[in-house]
Regions:
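Short beta-strand to alpha-helix junction loop
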Residues: 7-12, 90-96, 105, 141-164, ...
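Mobile amphipathic helical/loop "lid" adjacent to a hydrophobic cofactor/ligand pocket
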Residues: 12-21, 25-129
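Conserved beta-strand segments of alpha/beta enzyme cores
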Residues: 25-27, 169-172, 302-304, 333-335
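Conserved donor sugar-nucleotide recognition element shared by glycan-biosynthetic enzymes
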Residues: 132, 155, 346-349
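Helical element adjacent to the flavin cofactor pocket in flavoenzyme catalytic cores
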Residues: 135-184, 192, 196
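Mid-domain catalytic core of redox enzymes
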Residues: 175-281, 293-294, 375-378
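Conserved flavin/dinucleotide-binding core of flavoenzymes
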Residues: 248, 253-378
Length: 378
């Protein structure tokens, strides 16, 4: 099982250079999403297709009444605006919250709460859409331009593919470090010197990062039989806590044994805490209650819980006005990389890692010139 619900975006520029999606045997989700609407105790599923990629279903889904024609037109205009120009321009200009941005685009509360909140709340791992609009614009563009895919062997195949180029003999894991210096690491009571040290993590604090609950189920069959993500459109006005559900094995059959299905539910940490669900048992029961209302209690009762994962530092905080760069702090400081140095995404992590490697090469070759690596702000 992946640690959390992970997908790759094929539109990520730097990731596409560093990762061969074909060699990982990636398979895509279908563009768009399904949404579940619970009314008077009865669940209804509706499809929100992408009219740019699936024009016929896009037109049909525009007539299902889930969103108004006015909202759909405004979403279309927003898509056209965000997908134009250079990617770097997405990180310039206004830096308010995602909610502020959507409201400036004159989207209705219904569209925001029913569609954008469960989708992007589940991506950003926060339930108020307080993430910087710059990151929203970037992720929205990536989703519009590319596909969400699952590698055959899970998300771990991404670092493993990079490790192959380095050579497993050159990688040592599982060593507890007691002290970090620019050219030395202290572990097992001794100082070990190196040509250079790169710190690829942030030191967590009580207020650092966002947390998420991911619950994986083993089901005898898929409850959706669809290669879409299912969004909870009632998240804002009910006691439910699940942001979205996916059946990864519908997309990538290798994720479950033959004749079984893997069902994965995502619960944003601050939503669970707000609703008073902070233990594994209470979160699992709340998730089963949600899914039982959508798919039927009889169906969900046959599912076996495979894992209840509480990931405490799943993403760095990228609130509006929080400007992070991808450069080492100054002078001879230890080089630091990771998504916390840029923005919380696979692209942010890989782009930061590449830039740190360029800086490391510069130092090792005694090059005094400034590295002109990519610098982005959030």
């Amino acid at each position: 099982l992946d640690h959390g619900f992970h997908v790759l975006q094929t539109a990520y520029p730097e990731t596409s250079k560093q990762i061969d999606y074909k060699s990982l045997d990636c398979k895509p989700f279908k563009a768009g999403a399904r949404v579940v609407l619970l009314k008077n105790g009865k669940a209804r599923m509706k499809l929100m297709a992408d009219p740019w990629r699936d024009p016929i279903r896009g037109v049909l889904s525009s007539l299902n009444g889930f969103l108004s024609i006015k909202d759909l037109l405004r979403i279309g205009l927003m898509r056209l605006s965000i997908t134009r120009g250079k990617i770097d321009q997405l990180f310039d200009g206004s830096d308010e919250t995602t909610l502020d941005f959507l409201q400036r685009r004159k989207l209705s509360d219904k569209a925001i709460n029913r569609f954008f909140l469960p989708l992007f709340g589940g991506i950003f791992l926060e339930s108020k859409l307080q993430t910087s609009e710059r990151l929203f614009r970037f992720i929205f563009r990536m989703m519009a331009k590319g596909k969400m895919v699952l590698p055959k062997d899970g998300i771990r195949s991404v670092p493993l593919s990079i490790a192959k180029e380095v050579g497993q003999d050159n990688i040592r894991l599982g060593v507890e470090i007691s002290r970090i210096e620019e050219k030395a690491l202290r572990f097992r009571g001794e100082a070990h010197r190196f040509d250079l040290v790169i710190k690829a993590f942030s030191e967590p604090t009580d207020e650092d990062g966002k947390h998420v609950w991911t619950i994986h189920f083993d089901a005898p069959s898929s409850p959706m039989r669809s290669k879409h993500i299912l969004l909870n459109s009632n998240l804002i006005d009910s006691s439910s806590i699940v942001s979205h559900v996916a059946v990864p094995s519908d997309v990538q059959p290798s994720y479950a044994p033959s004749g079984r299905s893997l069902v994965t539910a995502t619960v944003v940490g601050d939503r669970a805490k707000e609703m008073g669900f902070e233990t594994r048992e209470s979160v699992e029961q709340a998730v089963r209650n949600d899914l039982g209302q959508w798919f039927g209690d009889g169906t969900v009762s046959t599912w076996k819980t495979l894992a209840i994962q509480h990931i405490t530092h799943a993403l760095p905080i990228s609130s509006s006005g929080k400007r992070l760069t991808n450069l080492p702090r100054n002078g001879e400081d230890t080089i630091e990389c990771g998504d916390h140095m840029l923005h919380g995404s696979v692209e942010g992590a890989i782009l930061s890692g590449r830039n740190s490697a360029l800086i490391a090469i510069n130092r090792l070759t005694n090059n005094t010139e400034t590295v002109q690596g990519p610098v982005k702000k959030v």
